[in-house]
A protein has these predicted regions:
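Binding-site signature for planar aromatic cofactors or substrates
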Residues: 1-198
Length: 198
């Protein structure tokens, strides 16, 4: 299928250097708030790129749960493929595609585990069903059927039917510490604005 004529013109207001904040994290916060105010669905969703020697680059969508001057935090299963890739090659990239605003933010840097205490703090805020799911989902592993997974969920729900649910040792957070943050604004005639913090 030839989709060469599938295009639209970007008519956004430009991005001038004088308008950018000195602190890239503050600039990200400003753009993130604008994306949120624009009712962009899952404005905290980003594409996370990792790599390994076996197949090379790999990418998937992940949800941002915290950001501050120390970096960008997301949570996942530590036994997942992405976690194994991060362990071997901690240099990663993330991309926020805020397409309705003709914007994207790209972050490149080093990914590192956060503390168990910090992971527990977030885990405790998750819905109970999601907490149970963290105990029974062997991410990136082949399972025999959907019913097998649902049975594991029922068993975990029964096991933790009373009281608080502990943090699984196989689940927790990562922080991406940026080396570069790039802000991109689409412009007409493909003369886009792009500014990079290093």
């Amino acid at each position: 299928m030839d989709i060469g004529d599938y295009r639209r013109e970007y008519m956004s207001q430009g991005l001038d250097r004088d308008e950018l904040l000195d602190d890239p994290f503050k600039q990200f916060e400003h753009w993130f708030q604008q994306a949120n105010d624009a009712d962009i669905q899952d404005a905290n969703a980003f594409s996370l790129a990792t790599t390994d020697l076996e197949v090379g680059p790999s990418i998937r969508t992940v949800l941002l749960k915290l950001f501050d001057e120390n970096g960008f935090v997301f949570f996942t299963n530590y036994n997942s493929r992405k976690s194994q890739q991060i362990k071997a090659y901690p240099q990663v990239a993330m991309l926020f595609p805020w397409l309705p605003l003709n914007r994207q933010v790209k972050v490149e840097g080093r990914c590192e585990k956060i503390s168990s205490a910090a992971s527990l703090k977030y885990f405790a805020t998750r819905p109970r069903g999601s907490q149970i799911g963290a105990w029974c989902s062997d991410q990136s592993e082949v399972i025999e059927s959907r019913s097998f997974l649902e049975q594991k969920y029922r068993e975990a729900a029964e096991k933790f039917k009373s009281g608080s649910i502990p943090l699984p040792s196989s689940w927790g957070g990562y922080r991406i510490v940026p080396a570069r943050i790039e802000f991109w604004q689409g412009r007409e005639n493909r003369l886009h604005d792009r500014f990079q913090y290093t």
